[in-house]
Amino acid sequence: PVTYDLWHSEAEEGQKLVNLIASLSKQGVRHEDIVILTPLSPKDSIADRVGLPTVAKQPVNADGILLASIASFKGLESRVIIIADCTSYADFSLYYIGITRATTKLYILESDAAKRQRISLMREHLNEQRL
């Protein structure tokens, strides 16, 4: 299943990410089963800027959440994937890599502009299928 979460500011996205990690932890999801993917360099990601103490930028240890660029995670997978920093789906092939990495649950934190673009892309795809 996919859960989309809309944000309107960087601060709101950061808070949503922190809350999501806390919620997953309360549900019993182990940190090593969570990966945060970003289209940006990990050091430029909201996950790094909010200072999540459990985020590891290198291969994950027993208690860490891996933070990686979408491109660097190609060919890998995780039970739970969180895609952060989504402001546009202009590079859809990159996002396709990210959205296909989750084996159990996918969360996408997206801006309002990205949401509108995603809906437009879905409509275009559906219209093409009807032709």
Model segments located where?
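Core RecA-like ATPase module of SF1/SF2 helicases and allied nucleic-acid translocases
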Residues: 1-131
